[in-house]
């Protein structure tokens, strides 16, 4: 009886799996797809073993007796009287020969039933298993499915917009110099609706009061941080301007020397996605004026400039498509270029990741700061804000017109804010801070890093002398002198190994700046209609403490990946991992970075604006941005601007006619022929025309997946459930047939 008890115990333990082998409480990590597949497979095995025991161990009696599920003749396996005390078979010569026919012959209908059920069930299960394995095989080695919005969004499947197949699109737009408090119902109505989560466009929206940039809060360091996930001290672009002593070369905007850009072991997002999916999905990235994306590494490899201890630079380090910087480009042309990428007519040529850079607000801010309503340049400033807002609105409308929003995610960010500087009142002159002889004897290079000064010395042994001379020459309430390696810990800027770092830095408080005499003269000659009788005027700058109010940046995510709600402020080093996640890049294929996972954790539980508690200097924010700033309304408790308060400033009247034309333009009018590195037909087909695009992905299926179709994960789960039900139904049917026959 011991063996029978053991088998019954096992049967009881597995019993629950028979009803629902895929129940949710069996999966403990709902965000780990690899664990999910493993758990699903484990459930399937348990379910199969459970039912196989039932198939092979139904109650049997010898000879012509009938089986009974609760009768006294219920037996399992070898008859117990054939075993000795140790469980070993005994001599069967004394046993009736008819009894030995148990389960071995076909003279009884009952054994035939058992054998048929076992073989047929096993066959069906084997077919199902092969199907499951083929379907479950991901496009890439390890899949990531951690979307937080629509359960129908899957980065690995193809969608259909009604005319063409698409892989999911991810578009990143960076608004240089755009502070989140610039958003208002009056000046940026579209961004206002996004920021308040009230945009009625059928897309989920996630936002945050502000995103924290990296120090120094300058354009090139922060744009490289956004796409690498690394602090500037780690990725090596430590400022907009610096000296590279190894190359004996100065870096500044416009320098495209690959030896500087590839100096550290960094990997921008376009390299990550193009490498991770190489050979599986024809994943391509396109960048439009993104800082650092137009570096040509071909010459670097051909001339063997790469150090011997490093491998040649991968071709994926350059985006498949990239556009060089053009400061004079109108926003209508920028929109046209982005839509050209979207409108490419085949999967093989269309990029799945597009990054665009919008410099307009930053360019204005450097000239005049952020003018308040009573200041001279306010109307010009609001016009600039309105143009940027309209650009974003028409970009989203272009996606909607093309029926792309159910599988397109848009990420809107900025790199930093802006601080107003009253000139010359709040400026100190570099030449007045250090004796001319000391500058000549000790200083090799002195660069203006925005409002800061970075000083490289000829001999590190002179650091203390120069440091103390500077400290005695400045107002330490407004300016702080730092020796490299002694920056505040929260800046994440201490690393003695980075050779791009200057020896000594002078960092002002927001609203103050260090300038050279020559620079001050140049600035004073600019167009400053706000200059008073004392020749005092306002400019703007950035580069300060990244936690300063003036330096805050924007983050808004919209699309099927995102949930609806707010998240707490976070560091911009999280954006790289966010983009990897949206695109479906597994963690093992991501480059090492400084992201903490904080953003991903928050996306799991978005909050309301009331739940995101913000303690802030709202008096200062009102004085700088006005009480009707959307930020002040949401988190400062200030009243909404009423129609009476609001001067009619409808941005539709300010729309660029060309931009309107492009947004409404059918994609058939946007065709492009580009030089490709692979054999791809030219884009002469129009997106809305009659075409028969072929599938070129590594998935064997050419079936068009509609934009509202279930994801691969949901589809597979349905197949598993259906197969399980099918097997159960077949077995029950066989039971009924055999029972009726007997």
Swiss-Prot record:
Function according to Swiss-Prot or TrEMBL: Mediates extracellular nucleotide derived phosphate hydrolysis along with NPP2 and PHO5.
Catalytic reactions of this protein: Hydrolytically removes 5'-nucleotides successively from the 3'-hydroxy termini of 3'-hydroxy-terminated oligonucleotides; a ribonucleoside 5'-triphosphate + H2O = a ribonucleoside 5'-phosphate + diphosphate + H(+); a 2'-deoxyribonucleoside 5'-triphosphate + H2O = a 2'-deoxyribonucleoside 5'-phosphate + diphosphate + H(+)
Lineage of source species: Eukaryota, Fungi, Dikarya, Ascomycota, Saccharomycotina
Gene: NPP1
GO terms (BP aspect): cellular response to phosphate starvation; nucleoside triphosphate metabolic process
Active site per the UniProt annotation: 219
Biased composition (Acidic residues): 640-659
Disulfide pairings: none
Post-translational modification: Autophosphorylated as part of the catalytic cycle of phosphodiesterase/pyrophosphatase activity. N-glycosylated.
Biased composition (Low complexity): 691-711
Organism of derivation: Saccharomyces cerevisiae (strain ATCC 204508 / S288c) (Baker's yeast)
Induction: Up-regulated during phosphate starvation.
GO molecular function, one term: phosphodiesterase I activity
Name this polypeptide is given: Ectonucleotide pyrophosphatase/phosphodiesterase 1
Residue spans, topological domain Extracellular: 135-742
Region (Phosphodiesterase): 168-545
């Amino acid at each position: 009886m011991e063996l029978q008890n053991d088998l019954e115990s096992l049967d009881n333990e597995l019993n629950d799996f028979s009803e629902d082998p895929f129940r949710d409480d069996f999966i403990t990590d709902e965000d780990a797809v690899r664990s999910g597949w493993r758990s699903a497979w484990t459930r399937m095995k348990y379910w199969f073993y459970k039912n196989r025991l039932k198939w092979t161990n139904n109650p049997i009696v010898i000879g012509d007796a009938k089986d009974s599920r609760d009768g006294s003749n219920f037996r399992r396996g070898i008859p117990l009287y054939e075993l000795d005390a140790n469980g070993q078979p005994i001599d069967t010569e004394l046993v009736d020969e008819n009894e030995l026919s148990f389960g071995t012959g076909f003279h009884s209908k009952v054994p035939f039933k058992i054998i048929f059920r076992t073989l047929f069930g096993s066959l069906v299960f084997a077919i199902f298993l092969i199907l499951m394995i083929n379907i479950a095989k991901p496009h890439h080695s390890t899949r990531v499915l951690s979307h937080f919005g629509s359960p129908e969004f899957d980065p690995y499947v193809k969608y259909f917009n009604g005319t063409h197949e698409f892989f999911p699109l991810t578009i990143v737009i960076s608004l240089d110099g755009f502070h989140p408090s610039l958003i208002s119902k009056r000046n940026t109505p579209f961004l206002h609706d996004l920021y308040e989560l009230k945009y009625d466009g059928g897309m989920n929206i996630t936002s945050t009061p502000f995103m924290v940039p990296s120090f120094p809060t300058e354009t090139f360091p922060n744009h490289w941080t956004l796409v690498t996930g690394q602090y500037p001290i780690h990725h090596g672009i430590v400022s907009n301007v610096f000296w590279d002593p190894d190359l004996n070369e100065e870096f500044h905007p416009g320098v495209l020397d690959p030896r500087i850009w590839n100096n550290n072991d960094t990997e921008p997002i376009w390299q990550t996605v193009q490498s991770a999916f190489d050979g599986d999905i024809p994943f391509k990235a396109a960048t439009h004026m993104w800082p650092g994306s137009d570096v040509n590494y071909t010459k670097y490899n051909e001339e063997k400039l790469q150090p011997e201890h490093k491998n040649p630079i991968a071709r994926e380090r350059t985006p498949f498509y990239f556009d060089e910087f053009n400061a004079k480009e109108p926003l209508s042309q920028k929109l046209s270029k982005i839509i050209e990428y979207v409108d490419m007519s085949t999967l093989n040529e269309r990029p799945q990741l597009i990054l665009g850079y919008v410099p307009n607000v930053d360019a204005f801010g450097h000239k005049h700061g952020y003018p308040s309503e009573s200041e001279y340049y306010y109307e010009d400033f609001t016009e600039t804000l309105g143009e940027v807002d309209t650009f974003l609105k028409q970009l989203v409308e272009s996606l909607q017109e093309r029926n792309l929003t159910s599988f397109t995610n848009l990420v809107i960010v900025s790199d930093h804010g802006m601080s107003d500087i009253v000139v010359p009142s709040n400026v100190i002159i570099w030449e007045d801070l250090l004796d001319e002889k000391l500058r000549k004897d000790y200083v090799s290079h002195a660069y203006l890093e925005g409002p800061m000064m970075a000083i490289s010395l000829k001999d590190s042994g002179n650091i203390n002398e120069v440091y103390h001379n500077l400290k005695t020459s400045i107002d330490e309430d407004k300016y702080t002198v730092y020796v490299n390696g002694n920056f505040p810990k929260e800046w994440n800027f201490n690393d003695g190994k980075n050779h791009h770092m200057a020896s000594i830095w002078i960092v002002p408080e927001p609203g103050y700046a260090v300038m050279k005499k020559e620079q001050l003269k140049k600035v004073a000659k600019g167009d400053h209609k706000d200059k008073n009788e004392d020749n005092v005027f306002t400019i703007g700058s950035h580069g300060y403490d990244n936690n300063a109010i003036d330096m805050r940046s924007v983050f808004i995510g919209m699309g099927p990946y995102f949930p609806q709600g707010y998240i707490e402020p976070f560091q911009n080093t999280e954006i790289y991992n966010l983009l990897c996640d949206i695109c479906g890049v597994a963690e093992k294929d991501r480059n090492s970075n400084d992201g903490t996972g904080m953003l991903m954790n928050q996306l799991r539980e978005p909050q309301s604006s009331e739940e995101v508690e913000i303690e802030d200097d709202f008096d200062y924010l009102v004085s700088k941005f006005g009480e009707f700033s959307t930020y002040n309304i949401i988190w400062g408790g200030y009243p909404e601007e009423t129609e009476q308060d609001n001067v009619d400033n409808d941005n539709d009247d300010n729309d660029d006619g060309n931009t309107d034309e492009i947004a409404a333009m059918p994609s058939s009018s946007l065709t492009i022929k580009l030089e490709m590195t692979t054999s791809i037909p030219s884009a002469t087909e129009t997106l809305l025309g009659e075409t028969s695009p072929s599938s070129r992905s590594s998935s064997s299926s050419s079936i068009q997946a509609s934009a509202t179709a279930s994801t691969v994960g949901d589809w597979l789960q349905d197949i598993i459930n259906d197969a399980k039900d099918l097997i159960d139904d077949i077995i029950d049917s066989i039971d009924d047939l055999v029972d009726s026959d007997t």
